[in-house]
Amino acid sequence: MKFIVKLFPEIMMKSKPVRMRFTKMLETNIRNVLKKVDESAKVQRQWDKIMVMVPDDRPDLVEAFGERLACIPGIAHVLQVNVSTFTSVDDIYQQTLVAYKEQLVGKTFCVRVKRAGKHDFNSIEVERYVGGGLNQFTEAAGVRLKNPDMTVHLEIDNDNLYLIDKRIEGLGGFPMATQEDVLSLISGGFDSGVSSYQFIKRGSRTHYCFFNLGGDQHEIGVKQVAYHLWQKYGESHKVKFISVPFDPVVQEILERIDNGQMGVILKRMMMRAATRVAQKMGIQALVTGEAMGQVSSQTLTNLNVIDRCTEQLILRPLIAMDKQDIINLSRQIGTEDFAKSIPEYCGVISQKPTVKAVLSKVEAEEAKFSEDLLDRVIADAEIIDIREIATQMDTKITETETVDSINANEIIIDVRAPEEEEKSPLKIDGVEVKAIPFYKLATQFADLDKDKSYLLYCDRGVMSKLQALYLQEQGYTNVKVYRP
């Protein structure tokens, strides 16, 4: 059994040196991926295709090889074939009859032949001869050249006959590492996962930069998304995962920045931090999952203001895509379930965000930041090889107890941002409620009465749980999540 790997058409259109470079890289990528499945994998490059050989004594590898080949960038489609030699056109027919006789019962069919090499016949002659024989000596319903029930595909390469057993659609795009590296800003949601995939498919080694706003549980969820994308579509090359602790930035934004400017300024700070990471890694472009008009910070005016904070190239592959199309693609690539479980943070967005930010006003607000703010968060950033995530996933995160009722000796802590808490304060008869924003809780919790139990509350129950997990990691056992 063999696989014939067909190159993506855009590769075929390249000049001879570029096409050769792309094909060599694809051969290497295929070998790197399949060797992880089984060391016996053999890959052979030819001018217009790549051959993958499956050992005769290992039929169990056929399905696994096919699945991996379907996810390697640069492949148009893969043909799963049985290989034999032939002596004449009639010999081709006889072999085809044996292979397809049972499959053709009651079906209309046509025969399609591709041929390479010197022969005393052409492709059409083979199609007519084989098709006529199959029509006469099988129980097929007849020949139909347009829209048949079944197409018999044959390929002839010199004296080799390839009986095509199965066609597997490929990923398309360019082979990994034929384009320059990019740094993708990943949050774990629908958009950033799909935008990362788009650049993997286009041949860029895609590294991941995550801005951590709320603890280990969120980070682990995002790492799972990044690891899935790398393992399924980009495993042929090593990439990095960078985690930047961004809660100090969020804290200063919430304490010092005008409410309407928060969203744009948060994005600008992320771009600045990502630029520093990218420059440190020698990467020239950032990738984001922003789509025009999807949220308030993604108007063209705001995107323009965001881009002014850096000279780094910012690429937005989803800029004109509809949200449903993005979700559909996330389902196709396997990130939808991850995205559904990734939290959206309450209290990190403006109550009345501007849709037409003015650069001068934004810069005036940014002057309120501590001078060393970005230096501090970049210094604390963690850079790991993405392969290390697999072992980190085995780390067990303590489950936080969630309650819907309040007992004696329990105090509720409202961890929402001040604007949200003031807009709809939490009031429960006979129960003490303390308002401590999530970004201050870590530093103020130690000052609270240790003989009391504390129930953390926020609208969505996400930030409260993450803060509870964080406090538990610090050794506090008197904390739960309150979800009425």
Swiss-Prot record:
GO function term, MF aspect, one: tRNA-uracil-4 sulfurtransferase activity
Keywords from the named record: ATP-binding, Cytoplasm, Disulfide bond, Nucleotide-binding, Redox-active center, RNA-binding, Thiamine biosynthesis, Transferase, tRNA-binding
InterPro entries with a match to the protein in the record: Rhodanese-like_dom, Rhodanese-like_dom_sf, Rossmann-like_a/b/a_fold, ThiI_AANH, ThiI_fer, ThiI_N, THII_Thiazole_biosynth_dom, THUMP_dom
Any GO BP: thiamine diphosphate biosynthetic process
Cited SUPFAM superfamilies: Adenine nucleotide alpha hydrolases-like, Rhodanese/Cell cycle control phosphatase, THUMP domain-like
Pathway the protein takes part in: Cofactor biosynthesis; thiamine diphosphate biosynthesis
Domain called Rhodanese: residue spans: 406-484
One Pfam family matching this protein: ThiI
Domain THUMP: 63-167
Localisation: Cytoplasm
Family: Belongs to the ThiI family.
Protein name: tRNA sulfurtransferase
Protein's organism: Shewanella halifaxensis (strain HAW-EB4)
Gene this protein is translated from: thiI
